[in-house]
């Protein structure tokens, strides 16, 4: 006869934590390093670039000679030997810490994994530009020094002052990424981890509030829903004066570059003659101070425009995600739409200058970033992101369904040649996009479920976000700021 054993049921977790999940989010802060820290940041970034390129060369050579694939674990263990190498040890062993170099190899490994998964192209070399970045994976601390400024402690850099314009979410700082942009400004992104619950409120079958979003060159965003709300949203990224100054600086840079190249060609000819005579070669000319100054001013102007574009994208995407439970976008392949029209020697392109101007206008408006950020925020709020085929949206009448390119009278005027319906051309396209998304969604899948569609149908990113939570969803938990404990 078998002996019975007592069984104690597992203790149930608190109700408030039954649906708790770990989420991660990052906040970006402007940093104000000392002169010594400024030099170290450039050295850290340059060392990471060197290690990343060295790791890529090792992987490429192993594949070329038919050897086994070099893994991240193998390369990360070789960091110590590399730092002790006499050839590199004089500068690589001083800075940065080994963990920072290992993070550069982790980024390289992630790039190869994405390539093997068919998501991106083959990893390229990290070129020497004005961008410097590295990631500190541990021992990141914060301490408050004033109501608006905080200091962050990073390995190898010590305490560095940052503009603490918003508190971090969560109590655990997982890593810190330091970025130096070409204009010399430095930013620190703090990645934090927090607990949050999955959204539990159902997605209401309310298609009237669904918004169609049309992206354009003259008007960046045209949004229209079924409740009669219509918006034309635009912002100039460049002022006329900045465009003139940018053009003038780029011309000055090219003149100085051409003069230096011409002088170096003459020096190369002289060196050939000196080599025959057995004389020492002459040194080539480096960048002049005037050329470097022009490049710094160009970088400053472009950084200013880039921040304006990012601010515009964040504001518009936040409004769309907050005010509409469904947003419908066109499936625009921006990468291919902005490809060069130069063609090849056998098949040269046409209207190259006009196409280049259109490409600049599309990239200035940030079409891809707008859809990408809106989709992320919709998922964060527990809403739906729909993507529909793009052909014909600008020449289709939403009233009668007639398709005719003659209906597009001008850039801003749409008059249907069949029923006479009149509307702003961009708002008309937004209405067509909205109706197309509703029809395809109802015909293809249940809108509440998550579904990854193809080019023949809509893409529905589900109402149950699995990565992030955000304010406004009504499902996030109260997080403890990382600075409150330090204060």
What are these regions (language model features)?
Residues 72-181, 343, 360, 364:
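Acidic carboxylate diad motif detector
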Residues 56-59, 63, 112, 116-123, ...:
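Long, hydrophobic, amphipathic alpha-helical segments used as structural scaffolds
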Residues 48, 52-59, 112-119, 219, ...:
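A generic secondary-structure signal for well-formed alpha-helical elements
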Residues 9, 132-147, 167-168, 210-213, ...:
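Short linear motifs in intrinsically disordered
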Residues 1-101:
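Gly/serine-rich nucleotide phosphate-binding loop at the start of the catalytic core
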Residues 55, 104-115, 427-436:
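Stable alpha-helical structural segments in soluble proteins, enriched in small hydrophobic residues
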Residues 4, 17-20, 24-28, 39, ...:
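Positively charged, helix-rich recognition surfaces that bind polyanionic ligands
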């Amino acid at each position: 006869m078998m002996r019975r054993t007592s069984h104690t049921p597992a203790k149930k977790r608190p109700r408030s934590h039954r649906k708790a999940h770990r989420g991660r989010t990052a906040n970006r802060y402007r940093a104000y390093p000392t002169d010594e820290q400024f030099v170290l940041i450039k050295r850290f970034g340059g060392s990471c670039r060197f290690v990343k390129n060295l790791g890529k060369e090792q992987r490429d050579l192993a594949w070329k000679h038919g050897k086994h694939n070099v893994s991240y674990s193998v390369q990360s263990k070789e960091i110590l030997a590399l730092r002790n190498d006499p050839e590199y040890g004089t500068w690589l062993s001083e800075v940065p810490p080994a963990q920072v170099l290992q993070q550069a190899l982790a980024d390289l490994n992630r790039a190869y994994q994405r390539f093997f998964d068919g998501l991106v192209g083959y990893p390229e070399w990290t070129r020497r530009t004005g961008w410097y970045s590295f990631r500190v994976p541990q021992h990141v601390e914060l301490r408050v020094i004033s109501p608006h400024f905080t200091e962050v402690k990073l390995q190898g850099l010590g305490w560095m002052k940052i503009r603490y314009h918003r508190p971090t979410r969560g109590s655990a700082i997982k890593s810190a990424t330091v970025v130096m942009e070409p204009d010399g400004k430095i930013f620190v992104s703090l990645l934090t981890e927090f607990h949050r619950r999955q959204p539990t409120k159902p997605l209401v079958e309310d298609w009237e509030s669904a918004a169609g979003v049309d992206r354009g060159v003259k008007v960046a965003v045209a949004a229209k829903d079924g409740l009669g709300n219509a918006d034309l949203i635009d912002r100039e990224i460049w002022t006329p004066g900045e465009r003139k100054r940018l053009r003038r600086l780029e011309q000055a840079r090219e003149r100085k570059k051409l003069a230096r190249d011409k002088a170096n060609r003459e020096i190369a000819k002289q060196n050939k003659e000196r080599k025959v005579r057995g004389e020492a070669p002459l040194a080539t000319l480096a960048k002049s101070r005037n050329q470097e100054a022009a490049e710094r001013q160009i970088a400053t102007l472009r950084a200013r425009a880039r921040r304006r574009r990012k601010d515009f994208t964040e504001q518009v995407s936040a409004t769309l995600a907050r005010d509409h439970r469904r947003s419908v976008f066109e499936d625009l392949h921006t990468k291919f739409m902005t490809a060069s029209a130069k063609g090849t020697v056998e098949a040269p392109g046409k209207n190259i200058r006009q196409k280049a101007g259109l490409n600049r206008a599309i990239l200035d408006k940030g079409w891809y970033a707008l859809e990408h950020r809106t989709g992320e925020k919709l998922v964060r709020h527990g809403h739906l992101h729909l993507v529909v085929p793009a052909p014909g949206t600008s020449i289709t009448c939403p009233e009668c369904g007639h398709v005719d390119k003659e209906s597009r009278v001008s850039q801003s005027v749409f008059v249907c040649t069949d029923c006479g319906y009149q509307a702003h051309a961009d708002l008309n396209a937004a209405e067509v996009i909205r109706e197309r998304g509703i029809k395809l969604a109802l015909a293809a899948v249940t809108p509440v479920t998550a579904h990854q569609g193809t080019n023949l149908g809509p893409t529905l990113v589900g109402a149950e976000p699995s990565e992030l939570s955000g304010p406004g969803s009504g499902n996030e938990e109260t997080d403890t700021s990382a600075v409150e404990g330090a204060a």
